[in-house]
Curated annotation (Swiss-Prot):
It comes from the Bacteria. This is Photosystem I P700 chlorophyll a apoprotein A2 1. GO terms for biological process: photosynthesis. Pfam families: PsaA_PsaB (PF00223). The chain crosses the membrane at residues 46-69, 135-158, 175-199, 273-291, 334-357, 373-399, 421-443, 524-542, 582-603, 650-672, 714-734. It catalyses: reduced [plastocyanin] + hnu + oxidized [2Fe-2S]-[ferredoxin] = oxidized [plastocyanin] + reduced [2Fe-2S]-[ferredoxin]. HAMAP family: PSI_PsaB (MF_00482). The gene is psaB1.
Length: 741
């Protein structure tokens, strides 16, 4: 007899109901719970999946290069990047009639195509790509790389090539390898590519596989490097009149510290970027030699964590906080590690979103407004999922892996002991932010509706304006630090009366970029609305994690695992309080918050791009302004994507907008009606099926049963999330592309 799905759990495989399928899907990635799983096998499986993950990433990148080279217009786009729309790929659809074919034949193509809003054209152009042949070459190289990684994944599952558990637990070796090998050497390699290929190409000098070994990136060669005269590499930078990809106005410098933007491309100077990556490489290669491995030299992380002295002075531990036992706790819990990694990656992803538009590093991307909007929104959405995931795995760690004995008296136990104070402070700040921010918005709404807008309560963000002024923004007249030519920040060593980054002050005071945008009362209000969302999301997640092991209401909570619906009907108050429930609830708040973040960013930028900042400034101070002048006004083109007169090139976004709403609304069916309703419905359908001629010839092996409450919630949450993302993505791209192409 064939073994039934799932193979990883005999208990589930023998379940006579449809639970077998749903629980198997839920537990598929929970390797720890699989039959016969050992700790060593767990690490080996996860290690092998990393290779598969990398293979998928390389395959994806390869497919982008391949489709653009095959069906795109890269070579045409290069000639006029400000006006030619980049093509992602062709579309073939048997449903297209003549009007649709005409609508989607755009950007100089011969047939229907999709426009690229990912920024890959700008990226490839900046790093030195110039021809379709180069794109094809890159595509084939990445395809081979992906194959290599797939093979490596398979190889590391073979008995002879499976690393031992001790190898996985060697934290210092892994840290050295990741710091020096991955971060350090890859940054050095990237600096090398920029210096040897990208910078010469930006100056009109071709560097390819045919001549890269014979073309020196700097006229002085390596002599300044070996003689310690490194300043030579910064002399003679590109001039303000440099035309990108030509020799006109170009210099010879390869490592500079100019600051600001290239006047024509409005992106960071390539020579500054190369300098940055070289510095990162040096730092990380040094950092990758700091930890003690086989040679008995360097730091032992365990000793540092357990230390009670700091340069001879007695302390509680690192940062004068007791970290005893943390090393083993961290090193023996994959969930603890994953929680940290997701938290760090989440912060970095949000940080990337903020920097991609304010300090654009790719040529001309600052003027591709739809791409800017898409990239910002994409990275902020990714960030919230990573952050919520961090708390989820932190809670799983506390339920499954936390050992109270091992962590006696250290910072982990200290946080758990102070959980009431932490949770109540988060609650207080959420209530304060919520009532005050909503109160201000509603007050302003009412007075505007009554025809007395001058009675609005408008608060200038003076502290934020002060910070901007300190960085050199002179508009506010606050005369402090870099905005005051007589201050020590302005006149400081090494170059008196000449700011360290000559291009910085020009950039921060230019009205045409997104660096340190001018802010006022509308920004003050939406900032606090976003702060409310962030603090409430954090409250739900922190409470869920800190109460995951037990609460006053349910002291034995940890015995029920990470996700459970209730402890039976006889124990009141135990429903909806598992750590999983806090993850589930927090995601609604996280989505809510990222909505406000992206609404704010998009509306503010639409005004800047259209040269009409007054609309945001005047109408963002009351709720109706947001509803009417941002959401309603910008959905007009979207709703008109197709109408009785035919279709236009926004119609695909109009359909996606509708479809997104449909998916989103479907979520509520699972979120509002729970198990009893569905069980009755299923029983009725089964009864009808069994009594219907012909239909009753078909039977099923599994008895149909309704989803559990937790499963229904996850299905509802998935629909809510996917619908939310699709709806806003369509709105964002159509409303921006409809205005700017």
């Amino acid at each position: 007899m064939a073994t039934k799905f799932p193979k990883f759990s005999q208990d589930l495989a023998q379940d006579p109901t449809t639970r077998r399928i749903w629980y198997a899907m839920a537990m598929g990635n929970d390797f720890e719970s699989h039959d016969g799983m050992t700790e060593e096998n767990l690490y080996q499986k996860i290690f092998a999946t990393h290779f598969g993950h990398l293979a998928i990433i390389f395959l994806w990148a390869s497919s982008l290069l391949f489709h653009v080279a095959w069906q795109g217009n890269f070579e045409q786009w290069i000639k006029d990047p400000l006006h030619v729309r980049p093509i992602a790929h062709a579309i073939w659809d048997p449903h297209f009639g003549k009007p649709a074919i005409e609508a989607f034949t755009q950007a100089g193509a011969n047939g229907p195509v999709n426009i690229a809003y990912s920024g890959v054209y700008h990226w490839w152009y900046t790093i030195g790509m110039r021809t379709n042949t180069e794109l094809y070459t890159g595509s084939v190289f990445l395809l081979l790389f992906a194959s290599l990684f797939l093979f490596a994944g398979w190889l590391h599952l073979q008995p002879k090539f499976r690393p031992s558990l001790a190898w996985f637990k060697s934290a210092e070796s892994r840290l050295n390898h990741h710091l020096a090998g991955l971060f350090g050497v890859s940054s050095l390699a990237w600096a090398g590519h920029l210096i040897h290929v990208a910078i010469p190409e930006s100056r009109g000098q071709h560097v390819g596989w045919d001549n890269f070994l014979t073309t020196a990136p700097h006229p002085a060669g390596l002599q300044p490097f070996f003689t310690g005269n490194w300043g030579v590499y910064a002399q003679n930078p590109d001039t303000a009149g440099h035309i990108f990809s030509t020799s006109q106005g170009s210099g010879t410098a390869i490592l500079t510290f100019l600051g600001g933007f290239h006047p024509q491309t409005e992106s960071l100077w390539l020579t500054d970027i190369a300098h940055h990556h070289l510095a990162i490489a040096v730092l990380f290669i040094v950092a990758g030699h700091m930890y003690r491995t086989n040679f008995g030299i360097g730091h032992s992380i365990k000793e540092m964590m357990n230390a009670k002295t700091f340069f001879g002075k007695p302390v509680e531990g690192p940062f004068n906080m007791p970290h005893q036992g943390i090393y083993d706790t961290y090193n023996n819990s994959l969930h603890f590690q994953l929680g940290w990694h997701l938290a760090c990656l989440g912060v970095v992803t949000s940080w990337v979103a903020q920097h991609m538009y304010s300090l654009p590093s790719y040529a001309f991307i600052a003027k591709d407004y739809t791409t800017q909007a898409a990239l910002y929104t994409h990275h902020q959405y990714i960030a919230i999922f990573l952050m919520v995931g961090a708390f989820a795995h932190g809670a799983i760690f506390l339920v499954r892996d936390y050992d109270p004995e091992q962590n006696k008296g250290n910072v982990l136990e200290r946080v758990l002991q102070h959980k009431e104070a932490i949770i109540s402070h988060l609650s207080w700040v959420s209530l304060f932010l919520g009532f005050h921010t909503l109160g201000l918005y509603v007050h302003n709404d009412v007075v505007v509706a009554f025809g007395t807008p001058e009675k609005q309560i408008l608060i200038e963000p003076v502290f934020a304006q002060f910070i901007q002024a300190a960085h050199g923004k002179v508009l506010y007249g606050l005369d402090t630090l870099l905005s005051n030519p007589d201050s020590v920040a302005y006149t400081a060593y090494p170059n008196y009366a000449n700011v360290w980054l000559p291009g910085w002050l020009d950039a921060i005071n230019s009205g045409t970029n997104s660096l340190f945008l001018t802010i006022g009362p509308g920004d003050f209000l939406v900032h606090h609305a976003i702060a409310l969302g962030l603090h409430t999301t954090t409250l739900i997640l922190v409470k869920g994690a800190l109460d995951a092991r037990g609460s006053k209401l349910m002291p034995d909570k940890k015995d029920f695992g990470y996700a459970f619906p209730c402890d039976g009907p006889g124990r009141g108050g135990t429903c909806d309080i598992s750590a999983w429930d806090s993850f589930y609830l927090s995601l609604f708040w996280a989505l809510n918050t990222v909505g406000w973040v992206t609404f704010y960013w998009h509306w503010k930028h639409l005004g800047i791009w259209q040269g009409n900042v007054a609309q945001f400034n005047e109408n963002s101070t009351y709720l109706m302004g947001w509803f009417r002048d941002y959401l309603w006004a910008n959905s007009a083109q979207l709703i008109n994507g197709y109408n009785p007169y035919g279709v236009n090139n926004l119609s695909v976004w109009a359909w996606m907008f509708l479809f997104g709403h449909l998916v989103w609304a479907t979520g509520f069916m699972f979120l509002i009606s729970w198990r009893g309703y569905w069980q009755e419905l299923i029983e009725t359908l089964v009864w009808a099926h069994e009594r219907t001629p012909i239909a009753n010839l078909i039977r099923w092996k599994d008895k149909p049963v309704a989803l559990s409450i937790v499963q229904a919630r996850v299905v509802g949450l998935a629909h809510f999330t996917v619908g939310y993302v699709l709806t806003y993505a369509a709105f964002l791209i159509a409303s921006t592309a409809g205005k700017f192409g």
